[in-house]
Amino acid sequence: MSDSLRIIISGGGTGGHIFPAVSIANAIKALRPEAEILFVGAQGRMEMQRVPAAGYEIVGLPVRGLIRPLWSPKNIGVALDYLKSLRQVRKIVKDFKPQAAVGVGGYASGATLDAAARLGIPCLIQEQNSYAGVTNKHLAKKASKICVAYDEMERFFPADKIMKTGNPVRQNLLDTKLTREEAIKTFGLDPTKKTILFVGGSLGARTINESILRRLDTIRKSDVQII
């Protein structure tokens, strides 16, 4: 094992977790090109394809989310898979010897940061949403720092651990050279009208879009443009 910076990043399940995780990894590599980064995800989930495509190594755990209702007998299997994942990721952490573990939410980050914290590895949580996820709320007591994008997150996390950093953004989005005029032309907008952008993150985007479609006629009567 080399003496270079080693970081484990864990989480996924949806793009809302995966892309911030990859952005964090890219930022670390930009600052410390020699850094070694290992991702830990959930077997069969989106991260197992997306992370290697971004150029990083990932290992998968047999972890799954709880099934509703919570008293479903199927959750016995979920609990057993979680215990199996804890054993596996404990060995992963011991072998990789990271200086820190970062959790971005999702099934795998619960087991990974649980194991890392028990082994004395400093843990950091990155919460992308204004309403904290179940996994991150569970991990809050174990985390050294909790990075958030919104105010009033003391509702979910210890105030002394919170750092308002904003959400990680992919560099290609920051590097865009598109002008306002080009954007107006691309979307076919009237520059004299007000414009509303409706955007949802990850799997929640479908619900948002369907809600807007049901109210589209009402919105159009307000003489605004919609993207």
Residue ranges of predicted features:
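Conserved nucleotide-sugar phosphate-binding/catalytic loop shared by glycosyltransferases and other
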Residues: S4-T14, A30, E34-L86
